[in-house]
Amino acid sequence: LQQCVSTLSLSLIRSLVAQVQVNGVDIEYEISGSGEPLLLIMGLGGQLTDWPQEFVDRLAQHFQVIRYDNRDSGLSSYSTVPAPTRWELIKGNLKPSSIEPPYRLRDMADDALGLLYALDLDDAHIVGISMGGMIAQLIAAGAPTSTRSLCSIMSNTGDRRAGRPTPGVVASIARRGQPDRSEALDVTIELFRLVGGRDWDEHEQRVRSAASLDRAYNPAGVLRQSQAIAASPDRTQALRQVTAPTLVVHGLEDTLVRPSGGVATAAAIPESRLIMFPRMGHDLPRSRDHELITAIRTNAARANAAPSRPS
């Protein structure tokens, strides 16, 4: 009976999938659970369905969880600007001022804030992963009254000296072209084999990635989002102004954004807390769900115990 009740409670917290227009962009989102709002921001090319469902369900037992597709991914709006070539991306990473992307990370942060405001929410706990961590950092630095707490997972500060991928990962990504739909799943799994930690579960990843690819496939959007990252400035100085309680999480086996990215992020944000998980790479292994969710809840509680945020 207890198991049946638990299963029923998890099914009931999956409540609403909808779309709203903000900043001239249609944003697909999903709301689960009840409680204080918590916004999940996905990484490069990821969709809202790329958050492990069990992780979302467990969070939704404590928060009103809002996850969404960034612009140029999933079921949100796609840019009509042609995707950059591989050479243009390399050039942009070497010299950010040489490119003019259709949008930057700042625009993506404004999308997230616009979604909150469209949902009639003044603020939320902000949790971002990888590129989503970069977006979350910009929200916390630029909109302190909208940020109850910040959790930046396997991300960096934009300082190109910190969190650099390993040479092997760089070489592997550089060798790849843009896969067609029939190849995309195998290419995704091959990448996770490179960047995932020892606790990464290939079967779970394959099932989740296959479902996301069936939902939407936009390789050009991945290139444009990559260009947005390359064109966005170092956030280190801005992060020194963050006042929200902050948790920084990184896997010690991350080869895509190496652990120095998390260390630099924690060093830049006053009074932040840093957790480095062994056996975790650039992934969210189920084995860390309990510890990660507990840490997120603890950080959120710091917000409730803190003095009022600046106006």
Predicted regions and their residues:
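Conserved alpha/beta-hydrolase catalytic His-Asp/Glu region
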Residues: S182-R224
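Catalytic active-site module of serine/aspartate enzymes centered on a nucleophile-bearing elbow/loop
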Residues: S272-S311
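Conserved HGGG/HGGXW glycine-rich cap/lid loop of the alpha/beta-hydrolase fold
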Residues: V25-G92
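Flexible "cap/lid" loop of the alpha/beta hydrolase fold
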Residues: L150-P179
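Short beta-strand/loop motif that positions the catalytic acidic residue
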Residues: V242, V248-H250
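Conserved acidic catalytic loop of the alpha/beta-hydrolase fold
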Residues: R106-A124
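Acidic catalytic loop of the alpha/beta-hydrolase fold
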Residues: E253-V257
